[in-house]
């Protein structure tokens, strides 16, 4: 069963009861994170979900309210003794942006793999599902994501 949780939907500045943008999906014991705004870790803990099964982090774009929670999350994953690779998916510039944020998390016990999106629409075959990325209209290059399981799409 696919489980979804909107961890945050605020913009620009976190508020006490409104964290910045992030959504987590769980399927077959694995988790996907879409965006990682400030407060993402708090939202995951409030939901009672675990960090360790996060295998994929997708970014829609690189405004701060969508990426500012990443350094802390990487440190938390490292402290959880994660050794499995972490896949990150996002628009062009992904590796440069992530590596700039890793200044405070330079030594991690797991590798990070990067998949930069270049086409208007791309489908990525995952373990038991498909992740479809598609361009959306914004003032910077931006993607939306659909999780496809069989004939169901979310």
Where are these regions (language model features)?
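Beta-strand-turn-beta hairpins that frame and shape the catalytic cleft
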Residues: 1-2, 122-131
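Active-site-proximal loop/helix segment associated with metal-binding centers of metalloenzymes
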Residues: 14-17, 127-151
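Generic structural signal for residues in well-ordered beta-strands
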Residues: 4, 111-114, 131
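Active-site neighborhood of divalent metal-dependent phosphoester bond hydrolases
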Residues: 82-118
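Conserved beta-strand hairpin/beta-sheet module of binuclear metal-dependent hydrolase folds
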Residues: 1-47, 145-147
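Structured loop/turn residues at beta-strand edges in well-structured enzyme cores
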Residues: 49-52, 110, 129
């Amino acid at each position: 069963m696919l489980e979804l949780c909107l961890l945050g939907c605020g913009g620009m500045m976190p508020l006490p009861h409104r964290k910045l943008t992030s959504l987590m999906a769980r399927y077959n014991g694995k988790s996907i994170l879409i965006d990682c705004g400030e407060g993402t870790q708090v939202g995951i803990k409030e939901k009672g979900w675990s960090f360790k099964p996060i295998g994929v982090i997708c970014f829609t774009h690189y405004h701060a309210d969508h990426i500012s929670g990443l350094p802390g999350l990487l440190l938390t994953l490292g402290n959880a003794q994660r050794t499995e690779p972490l896949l990150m998916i996002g628009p062009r510039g992904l590796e440069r942006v992530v590596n700039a944020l890793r200044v405070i998390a330079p030594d991690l016990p797991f590798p990070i793999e990067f998949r930069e999106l270049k086409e208007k629409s791309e489908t990525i075959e995952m373990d038991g599902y498909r992740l479809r990325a598609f361009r959306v209209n914004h003032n910077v290059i931006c993607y939306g994501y659909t999780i496809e399981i069989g004939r169901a799409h979310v």
